[in-house]
Amino acid sequence: MNSGGGIVAAAAPSSGGGNVEWHVRPPNPKNPVVFFDVSIGGIPAGRIKMELFADIAPKTAENFRQFCTGELRKAGKPLGYKECQFHRVIKDFMVQSGDFLKNDGSGCMSIYGHKFEDENFTAKHTGPGLLSMANSGPNTNGCQFFITCAKCDWLDNKHVVFGRVLGDGLLVMRKIENVAIGPNNRPKLAVVITECGEM
């Protein structure tokens, strides 16, 4: 999934990660849990709670966590996902967000600077509700991410999986997945992260 709008379609052979079903793996109590409160067309849609796989991909998880909490600041203002939109939705595939710079899929930055490397491909896209980094090729991770709506194994070894949606957050994800879309798979109603943080 290219953060600029294209989709990586080539399959890669699966390696590592064993037979773990990452979307239903038992939670690790040491991993951070973050949340998004989401609105659709200005109407509250619910909360998405997410476990970040700091035990598997600590650098990627920390990048996402800090954009949830707003710890990173520029000129005294928090940088992160609050007021960011889900700019790309493809039913039965994924919902994409994280471009708080431009809200159109072209913005890129990380807590480490501009882009950072693919940490590892240990976790796989085994089912719905997995958090994975959007990119424009190898080692181009920034702030954009997507949540899987189904198994997407053709993305394995190309996109870094770093967390998963917990519990009822999947219902909110399904609401986002089912919004009407216009050109470039952009929702016709604004889907906005109204609040975010760490639990």
Swiss-Prot record:
It comes from the Eukaryota. InterPro entries: Cyclophilin-like_dom_sf (IPR029000), Cyclophilin-type_PPIase (IPR024936), Cyclophilin-type_PPIase_dom (IPR002130). It catalyses: [protein]-peptidylproline (omega=180) = [protein]-peptidylproline (omega=0). Residues 35-198 form the PPIase cyclophilin-type domain. Gene3D superfamilies: Cyclophilin-like (2.40.100.10). One of its GO terms (molecular function) is peptidyl-prolyl cis-trans isomerase activity. Keywords: Chaperone, Isomerase, Rotamase. Ubiquitous. Its EC number is 5.2.1.8. GO terms for cellular component: plant-type vacuole; plasma membrane. The keyword Cell wall biogenesis/degradation does not apply. PPIases accelerate the folding of proteins. It catalyzes the cis-trans isomerization of proline imidic peptide bonds in oligopeptides. Belongs to the cyclophilin-type PPIase family. This is Peptidyl-prolyl cis-trans isomerase CYP22.
